[in-house]
Amino acid sequence: MLILLLSSSCQKDVNLEAVRLVERAAMPQPTAAGACFVYEDNIYLFGGRDSFSTNHNDLWAYSTTTDTWRKVPTHVPLKARVSASACVVGDCAYIGLGFDGKVQRDSSYLCDFWQYNFKTLKWKRLADFPANTTVKNCLFATEDAIYATYGFNREFTQDIYRYDIQENTWTKLDVSAPCSVPRAMDVVGATCQGRHFVGTGFNHGSLRFWAEWDPDNRQLIPRKKILGAGRNAAVCCATDDYVYLAGGRHYGDTLTTGFFYNSIQRYSPQHDQWEYVGSMPYEAENMVIAYINEQIFIGLGENKEGIIQDKWYRFEE
């Protein structure tokens, strides 16, 4: 079904621009706060929570060629969790970290880190993450390393750890950042044109910051802030030319000034500029977004009524 979406009258920061979303096959298991990664023609989704607030450790695959979801027939050795982190290097996915409980206890912050080989279909446990700041770490992958940025455990961080793929070791890096790049939790990020970008999130309020991670000089460099009010629990992906940011929520100073987002905006690394490009058919946090085969797919998440979504769309400009 082809949907033409205009700005939502209740969303203050959506311009009168149209975005075309093609509704695709719904996810069989409504999910929020899952970890997403792509390989060949499939979008993979690990973990997250369902409509009954149950955490899962299932691994699902969505085929972009057949428009079908399937549960991957593998014994996943990871515990059920939300807010895990994942990325792909070569023929392997790297998955782990996250939170497995509903109460704030140290054992709920998970430090395990795993490799899933798409060719052999085997799992391998790797070196544990060396800190317990394991909620929603944003991962950036290069050929020989993975950078785990930010994360959370009862305090806001600006930490960056480097995982050496060959040596199977983690190293905490000394990072240089100006005051305009805050400590935070619940950030998002993506790699575009070989450059790594991270931002938004929460620190005593929803944030608008946007920064570039320069691994060679170990610097977080301020970039143009996102449009509108701050947001956290958003999702982010990158095409060859742009970084797309969608959904999330804004925490207000009172119970009546907070709101959820359905807006989609994109960032041009070349021009260091943001622009609105449209909106989702619903407002939600902790959705999933992925770029694969020159297409963006987006959906799932939790709306402001606390309902976990199963909707799935292909985004077209």
Label each residue range with its predicted role.
Residues 1-3:
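Sec-dependent signal peptide recognition
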Residues 6-9:
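C-terminal motif of bacterial Sec signal peptides marking the signal peptidase cleavage site
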Residues 11-317:
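Kelch-like beta-propeller repeat domains
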